[in-house]
Amino acid sequence: EVTALVVDNGSGMCKAGFAGDDAPRAVFPSIVGRPRHQGVMVGMGQKDSYVGDEAQSKRGILTLKYPIEHGIVTNWDDMEKIWHHTFYNELRVAPEEHPVLLTEAPLNPKANREKMTQIMFETFNSPAMYVAIQAVLSLYASGRTTGIVLDSGDGVTHTVPIYEGYALPHAILRLDLAGRDLTDYLMKILTERGYSFTTTAEREIVRDIKEKLCYVALDFDQEMGTAASSSSLEKSYELPDGQVITIGNERFRCPESMFQPAFLGMESAGIHETTFNSIMKCDVDIRKDLYANTVMSGGTTMFPGIADRMQKEITSMAPSGMKIKIIAPPERKYSVWIGGSILASLSTFQQMWISKQEYDESGPSIVHRKCF
């Protein structure tokens, strides 16, 4: 019995592992780095490219590129390097021996799914593969088949209504505001405090500050008042060089931009309005089920206080008396991967794989018929 591989390629992090496991074995940055300078030491074995953590640790001498932008693959050569690294260095498996389940962003262009399929069968010789929509997997991981998923990662945020296991494409909304934008915004507002962060390497420090210290205020204006009148909300953070910085209202001003994108100079609706708009695009008969099953997934939904704030905002927009439930599972950072692990190990799923034989007969377009 061969174990399937599950690979969730996010804009910021790649999560990979084996079907049936309860967590991914490998989680590493979706980065490919290339040296900025010519190597001078002969025989040092300098590589022309580095992937993931190795690229991250050598970031001072590299130019870092993310092949996945806003959840969609934009650079296939680099993407191939990431998959190669996933199979051979992280999971240490021969890809030609295992079926592989890949994930894709909602509303992924058709040509992209075909390209993924082609690379798996032609470059890696996979025996079988499948492409699943990320938000649907998150819903499976929460034990549901109907609900609306607010999936927010590093590169993109989507609201995806799902009914009986099928995503409803006409009601899916995308918001190009996610973790990376919040990190950039935090860099900007820390600069106003007199701390300067500019390089790609320093951006990673700010990302860490964001992950450790930021939270969502239940009432933004009230929180701003508290922050102005006392130092109770201030926290300190030690930089790698030993310098200690203090951060106050930036802690909640940064993630507030999820609810008020105007902070970032964007005209779009916040995540609460986007979720509401997505529900309103659905058939009136299923809205009740969506309000009662609003599932959060992705790393950018990990801020403390986000579920309570979401509950408050949706309640104020929804019809009065509507039962509203925001589900924020503790493992939601990896719920897409976990859903993939569950799906790929179901006995009923085994007939869903696209086999190498089917691919050879029909070509890349087979993916549209078998994966939906």
Swiss-Prot record:
GO molecular function, one term: hydrolase activity
Keyword field: ATP-binding, Cytoplasm, Cytoskeleton, Hydrolase, Nucleotide-binding
Catalysis performed (reactions): ATP + H2O = ADP + phosphate + H(+)
Keyword Transcription among record annotations: no
Official protein name in the record: Actin
Top-rank EC class of the record's enzyme: hydrolase
Subcellular location: Cytoplasm, Cytoskeleton
Gene Ontology CC annotations of this record: cytoplasm; cytoskeleton
Family stated for the protein in its record: Belongs to the actin family.
InterPro entries xref list: Actin, Actin/actin-like_CS, Actin_CS, ATPase_NBD
